[in-house]
């Protein structure tokens, strides 16, 4: 079971499916872009409880938010199969360490694999703790810095968004000689139709446009003449 079908979660789900596993995935904010990349062999379920109830292996790939802090805890462990294996390479605070220690001790969880070592986790019987590398090397830090600068420049010069925390990835490519208008808005019905009506009333022609949404936020780009 894969909880969180973002860029990494989709890759994990597809890889597990290619290994011959029956894969369940859950993500209430699954983007169209990631849905297209997801193998058709993956079963999408409506909530995490279905994964807790059915899966022998559970891996989490969600951000650290108030709503996800300690999401794996005694209540959710009690829903899982006996002997479940859990993988956490996302964020350390997603797992309640004390409840995980109890679940490992009583056999509810047979193995906990993570790359977030701390004194509690490294002393848990049944925990397989790996080094957390991330962007710790000099080369990766430099690459991350260059990538961040390029993405900020692309937004400032062209209005394109990539790898935003709250907004969807959205691009119209390089800005042409025409003007480009970018609108950040809540993901509500009829916003795009209202915007295009305003352009029409002002006698502005739309030569190209794109609109993407992610959760409660959306982003629209218009090339106008």
Task: Give the residues covered by each predicted segment.
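Hydrophobic Val/Ile/Leu positions in short beta-strands of Rossmann-like dinucleotide-binding domains
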Residues: 1-2, 183
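Glycine-rich Rossmann-fold phosphate-binding loop(s) that bind the pyrophosphate
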Residues: 5-6
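N-terminal Rossmann-fold NAD(P) dinucleotide-binding loop
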Residues: 9-10
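Aromatic pocket-lining residues of Rossmann-like dinucleotide-binding sites
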Residues: 15-16, 80
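Residues at the starts of beta-strands that form the adenosine-phosphate
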Residues: 21-22
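Conserved acidic E/D residue at the C-terminus of a beta-strand in Rossmann-like folds
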Residues: 27
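Rossmann-like adenosine-cofactor binding region
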Residues: 30-121, 136
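NAD(P)-dependent dehydrogenase/reductase Rossmann-like domain
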Residues: 112, 122-125, 133-225
């Amino acid at each position: 079971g894969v909880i969180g079908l973002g860029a990494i979660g989709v890759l994990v789900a597809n890889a597990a499916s290619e290994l011959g596993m029956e894969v369940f995935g859950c993500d209430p904010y699954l983007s169209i872009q990631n849905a297209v990349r997801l193998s058709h062999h993956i079963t999408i379920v409506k909530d995490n409880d279905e994964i807790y109830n059915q899966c022998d292996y559970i891996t989490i790939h969600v951000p650290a938010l108030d709503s996800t802090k300690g999401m794996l805890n005694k209540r959710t462990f009690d829903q899982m199969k006996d002997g479940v294996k859990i993988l956490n390479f996302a964020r350390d605070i997603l797992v309640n360490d004390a409840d995980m220690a109890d679940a490992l001790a009583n056999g509810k969880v047979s193995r906990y694999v993570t790359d977030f070592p701390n004194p509690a986790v490294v002393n848990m019987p049944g925990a397989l703790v790996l080094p957390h590398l991330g962007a710790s090397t000099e080369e990766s830090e430099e690459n991350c810095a260059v990538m961040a600068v390029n993405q900020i420049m692309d937004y400032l010069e062209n209005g394109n968004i990539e790898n935003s925390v709250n907004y969807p990835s959205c691009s119209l490519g390089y800005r042409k000689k025409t003007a480009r208008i970018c609108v950040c808005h809540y993901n509500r019905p009829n916003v795009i139709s209202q915007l295009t009506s305003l352009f029409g009333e002002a006698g502005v022609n739309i030569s190209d446009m794109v609109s993407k949404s992610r959760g409660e936020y959306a982003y629209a780009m218009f090339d106008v003449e």
